[in-house]
Each structure stands twice: as C-alpha cells, then as structure tokens.
Amino acid sequence: MAELQMLLEEEIPSGKRALIESYQNLTRVADYCENNYIQATDKRKALEETKAYTTQSLASVAYQINALANNVLQLLDIQASQLRRMESSINHISQTVDIHKEKVARREIGILTTNKNTSRTHKIIAPANMERPVRYIRKPIDYTVLDDVGHGVKHGNNQPARTGTLSRTNPPTQKPPSPPVSGRGTLGRNTPYKTLEPVKPPTVPNDYMTSPARLGSQHSPGRTASLNQRPRTHSGSSGGSGSRENSGSSSIGIPIAVPTPSPPTAGPAAPGAAPGSQYGTMTRQISRHNSTTSSTSSGGYRRTPSVTAQFSAQPHVNGGPLYSQNSISIAPPPPPMPQLTPQIPLTGFVARVQENIADSPTPPPPPPPDDIPMFDDSPPPPPPPPVDYEDEEAAVVQYSDPYADGDPAWAPKNYIEKVVAIYDYTKDKDDELSFKEGAIIYVIKKNDDGWFEGVCNRVTGLFPGNYVESIMHYTD
C-alpha cells in the first residue's frame, strides 16, 4: 500500500515535471542551434554541434518517458493485485452466506419431520445349533456313467471282424467352406472368407446297398497262374471321411499277389457283360486250396482277401469286358442303367495291370434275389470260416480307365492330376462344379482351404477336394 502511495504522490508527478522541462529545453536548444548555424563562419562545425545537441536531447527525453512508463505499469500491477484480493474476499463472503442459508433451511426442514426409532441388529447371525460335519465316505469311480451320453457309437454295434459284406462308407458330412460370392469373377481362393456357410452333406445315391444274401461262396473252375507278389499300399480317403476300408477288415497292409491277366480271347464272353462298355470292371479272385471263389464288383474299394461277396449279378451296369493295354479303339458310351441293379462307382484304389495270364471263362453268377433291402440295418451275416493266409492267393484288381489311351478334347493341356468323383456334388455358388459319381475331373489348381479347381466336361470351376480320389495307374 505504501508503494502504491509513493508512486501516486512522488514518482509519477516527478516524471511528468521532468518531461515538461525537457520540452522547454528542447525549444531553447533548437533556437540556439539555428542562430549558431546562421552566424557561424564554419558551417560544418556548426552542423556537427547541432547534431550533438539533437542526439543528447532525444536520449534525455526517451529516458524520462521510459521511467514514467515503468512507474505507471507498476502502479497498474499493484492495483490489479488489490482487485484480485478484493474479489477473493467477496467470493468467500458469498460462500459463507450460502452455507448459513443452507443451515437455516435444513433446520427449518428438520422442524417439519418426525423422529424414527431404528433398532440396530447384526447383519450376520450365527446359527443356534451348529451343523455337524459330514463324514467323508469314499465311493468307487463308475466309468460307465457317461456311456449313454452324447452321440457316440456304442461298442456293441460294431461289425465283427472280417465280415463278408461289401459295405460302403458314408459320404463326408463336412466339406471345405464354400467360397465367398465376391470371388465369382475369378476362380482364385486367395480372398479371405467373411462368413462360413453351413455345410450341406452330399447326397447318397439310392442304388447303393449291401447284399447279405449274396455272401454264399460261388465256386468256379480253378485257375492256375504264375503269381507276382506285389505289395499294395492302402489309399486313405480324403476330406476326413475315414478309411475307405470296411470297419471289420483287418488286413489293410497285407501284401497281395497280383496274377497277370491275359488279353481277351475270342471265346464266348460272360452273358452279363456289355460288349461296348466304356467303363471297366474290377475282378477279384481268391484261391483257397482246390476251390476258387470269384467275386465281381464294379467299384474301386480295397477289400481283404476274405471277401466272398458277389455284387454284380445282372448285366454289368458300370463295366464291361476287360480290355487289355493294347486295345486302342474307343468304346461307345455305356448302356443305360437298369433301375434295380446295384451299382458301385468307379472309385477307390484304381489300378491298371498290364500282365498276361492263361484264363478260362467263368460261368456267370446267379441272378440276385428280389428281396434285397436297400441299406438294410439288420445285423450282418456271420463271417466266413477263417482262411489260412499262407495258402491263400491274393486278388487281382483291374480297372479300365475310359481316358487311359488319351485325354479327351476338352481336357486342359497342363493339369496337376486326374481324379475321379466318389460322391455326387451339386454346386452352391456360380463358380463351382456339379458332377455325378464316377465323373473324371482334371485338377489344375489345389488351394490351401481344401478346394480344388478343375475341368469336367468342358466346365471349369471349384469343387471340394474330399469328394474326389486320385487315379493312379500301375505299370510294370
């Protein structure tokens, strides 16, 4: 406060007086310099003296103005601080008044209320009678409690080992996720999937059925041939569909002897064979001691040597006479299918054997009974008597590829492999393929997601890889 008073009473008024005096002195100095320049003989010296007076006068006036301005700014700062202190005091007083008003209001509100008596009790009340601890009694673990829970297959429903039924595995219940619709223009699978669509299981053709009634051993005239032992490895099915073998088969990796078949002779063919069939048949011959049991089926499944099923009794639907490797003529398309004839597709472990064997024609198998059920759920027939594997000769697997001698005109020039469809598939998207069982597809690209890109009947598209199986040709 004293500093403010000193500024207002002493320093600021003295600064004003100094400025007024400087103004008067500047007027006198100007008059002197003018007269001196006019009267002096040495004009140059007079000019230099005038410059010196001018510089000194301006410096003196500037100093006085600076001192007065600093005093005024200091005065303003002191007054601003005093205003802030006054504002703080006023705010404190207003808050005190508000607190007093709130206290008075609460007191007035409390007068209008009534007192309430509350009894305080403990939140947790201990029980009057303590519970006695239960004695631990060990109970044995029952491992069969969860046997009937879930969708598992019971152990009792498994088929006995080495049954004679020629069963067929179900189509895979899952396929690779369908490609997104955005990839319609291109056949690439590089674009990430957005939403996985539910998987539609493939449909099973109605013409598949087991033939329990045909399990009787059909004896045919014995065949003698020189056997070449060749180990055959099992080809697992693709797409998680499990093993292609029957669940009861126990000789998957047993080497079997492959006799060398002779080229077709001019003798009479079997009555059930279609002479112009384009597809081949798979013949399995099993020789035991002095009798030979032959079973003919139009499929590509690997069977154990103990299989004695006669599966194709009527005229061959999907096959015809066995063509040798030297046959070059292209056969006409296969005859129409009878509706009730059981059919096995050209799948499985497909082989083409180029060998020679002296073979005599076998009598045709008997016609099938009329009461064969479709997909019979009855228990399988009892297994045949055990076979001595040392005296048993292995089966011959022959398959005539319709495109073995040359690829068709619509086949691509460069492809990864040639596959055969083992299930029917109907396309879900526009860039996919639709094909029937037994169709030949040329794979031109394999994607990491399980989908293949291939050509079938002049149509290029995508298809799940677990619906096809590779065609492998064996040569000597």
Curated annotation (Swiss-Prot):
Keyword list, A-Z: Acetylation, Cell projection, Coiled coil, Cytoplasm, Cytoskeleton, Nucleus, Phosphoprotein, SH3 domain, Synapse
Q: Which Pfam families match?
A: Abi_HHR, SH3_1
Q: Name one GO cellular component term.
A: growth cone
From the record, give the cysteines joined by S-S bonds: none
Q: Where is the t-SNARE coiled-coil homology domain?
A: 45-107
- Recorded GO MF terms: protein tyrosine kinase activator activity; SH3 domain binding; signaling adaptor activity
On the tree of life, the source organism's domain of life is Eukaryota
- GO biological process assignments: cell projection morphogenesis; dendrite morphogenesis; lamellipodium morphogenesis; megakaryocyte development; neuron migration; postsynapse to nucleus signaling pathway; somitogenesis
Protein localization = Cytoplasm; Nucleus; Cell projection, Lamellipodium; Cell projection, Filopodium
Looking up PROSITE patterns in the UniProt record yields: SH3 (PS50002), T_SNARE (PS50192)
Residue numbers of N-acetylalanine PTMs: A2
Cite the InterPro entries for this sequence.
ABI (IPR028457), Abi1_SH3 (IPR035725), Abl-interactor_HHR_dom (IPR012849), SH3-like_dom_sf (IPR036028), SH3_domain (IPR001452), T_SNARE_dom (IPR000727)
**For the modification Phosphoserine, which residues carry it?**
S178, S182, S211, S217, S220, S287, S291, S434
Q: In which tissues is it expressed?
A: Widely expressed in brain, high levels detected in cortex, hippocampus and cerebellum (at protein level).
What sequence ranges are listed for the domain SH3? 414-473
Q: Compositional bias of type Polar residues: which residue ranges?
A: 156-170, 217-230
Modified sites of kind Phosphothreonine: T169, T173, T210, T475
Q: How is it modified after translation?
A: Phosphorylated on tyrosine residues after serum stimulation or induction by v-Abl. Seems to be phosphorylated at Tyr-53 by ABL1, required for nuclear but not for synaptic localization.
| Bias (Low complexity) | 243-253, 267-277
Q: How does it assemble?
A: Interacts with ABL1, ENAH, STX1A, SNAP25, VAMP2, EPS8, SOS1, SOS2, GRB2, SPTA1, NCKAP1/NAP1, the first SH3 domain of NCK1 and through its N-terminus with WASF1. Part of a complex consisting of ABI1, STX1A and SNAP25. Part of a complex consisting of ABI1, EPS8 and SOS1. Component of the WAVE2 complex composed of ABI1, CYFIP1/SRA1, NCKAP1/NAP1 (NCKAP1l/HEM1 in hematopoietic cells) and WASF2/WAVE2. Interacts (via SH3 domain) with SHANK2 and SHANK3, but not SHANK1; the interaction is direct. Interacts with the heterodimer MYC:MAX; the interaction may enhance MYC:MAX transcriptional activity.
- What is the protein named? Abl interactor 1
- This chain's source organism reads Rattus norvegicus (Rat)
